[in-house]
Amino acid sequence: MGIPEENSLVYDWTEQGPRRARWPGHVMLDDETLRDGLQSPSVTDPPIDTKLQILHLMESLGIETADVGLPGAGERQREALLQLCREIAQHHMRIRANCAARTLMVDIRPIAEATQLTGVPIEACLFIGSSPIRQYAEEWELDDVLRHSREAITFALREGLEVMYVTEDTVRSSPDQLRILLKAAVEAGAKRVCLCDTCGAAAPDAVYNLVTWVGALLCEIGSPQVGIDWHGHRDRGLDLANTMVAIEAGASRVHGTALGIGERVGNTPIEQILVNLKLLGIRNDDLTRLPEYVQLVSQVTRVPIPVNAPIVGHDAFRTATGVHAAAVIKAHKKGHTWLADRIYSGVPAGWIGRSQKIEIGPMSGNSNVQHYLASHGVPVTPELTKRIMDEAKKSPRVLTDGEILEIVRGFSP
């Protein structure tokens, strides 16, 4: 059999059938780890020197924007904002800063001061609840929300800040109210609007309908240049699907956090967004430092990485199953690295500096053992293979390196 073209080996159903995704040429990323990520009730807020490391790792991954805090929350957040902006200035970093603020002058003023002190442009992300349920709970009238929004945007622009207008709980807001609020925000000077699934309540169809509707609204009011952001949460476990649908529908920037940490059960994991956009050819970032980034965030926030976490979990590229391992080994024997990295993996491990790992356990076959021994420089014999297989079949779990090497040392044919 001749060597086939790689793209002929994997059939892509996204290109066939009645529903064909329409992906943009590029989409930007906004990393919320240092703001929304730190709103998780279980995280530890890391020291500033670690936040600076995190910022540099974001840039190494090609992330365009970092949310550097919520200065209205207190002095610690205001000081972190200044230090992060100074780091951007001193190192001439490409990553841009934005900052969350309520539609209150007391929240916006520290952002303007940070820009003035550091010379770093900061996008003010001015948020206010737009849904009827929030307005009822707060006893707000729509006119109050509208007035606060206009005043805040006008003040921020006067202070020299670019503005993104953020409607909290957008997915549960009515078109009539959104039309009024978004039109007023754009007329006041907002350069972007952010649509939020603040409570993780939406399903993909709702997200597609919302983002498409907002895109049409912006065209209708003569402002197609205004960018659309998408900010999702994972309460229903639909965060990544919703983010991808938002991109398809026209969002030009999407938000995420390392490991998906954030308010309640968290946000869309940015490592998953990065990999999926690369798989689709929308972005082509160097992701070899992605594990380092996620591991650092995990370590300093004290949020453990689940072993089965996509892409960055310990088990992401491990197998001890005989059928799976045999296929990977056959691909290696063909000298076909591309094939070996995809035959039983939807994500190429090599993209993030990892490799497919074959282990030995109760579901293994002889090929697992033979591959393991050969890769550890141990002569492969039928007798040793059988001995290790016998032990593996009796074990309730995958054998450790120490256990396998102990069998090897104690083996006498």
What is each PLM-predicted segment?
Residues 1-103, 360, 364, 370, ...:
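N-terminal capping/small domains of soluble enzymes
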Residues 2-4, 23, 29, 45-64, ...:
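Alpha/beta enzyme core
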Residues 2-35, 283-413:
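A mid-to-C-terminal "edge-of-domain" accessory segment
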Residues 36, 40-41, 72-75, 131-134, ...:
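Short, small-residue-enriched loops and turns at beta-alpha junctions
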Residues 46-49, 53, 75-79, 106, ...:
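Conserved active-site and cofactor/substrate-binding residues in soluble primary-metabolism enzymes
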Residues 69-71, 100, 127, 166-168, ...:
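Generic beta-strand/beta-sheet core signal
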Residues 199-202, 206-337, 345:
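Catalytic alpha/beta core domains of metabolic enzymes, predominantly
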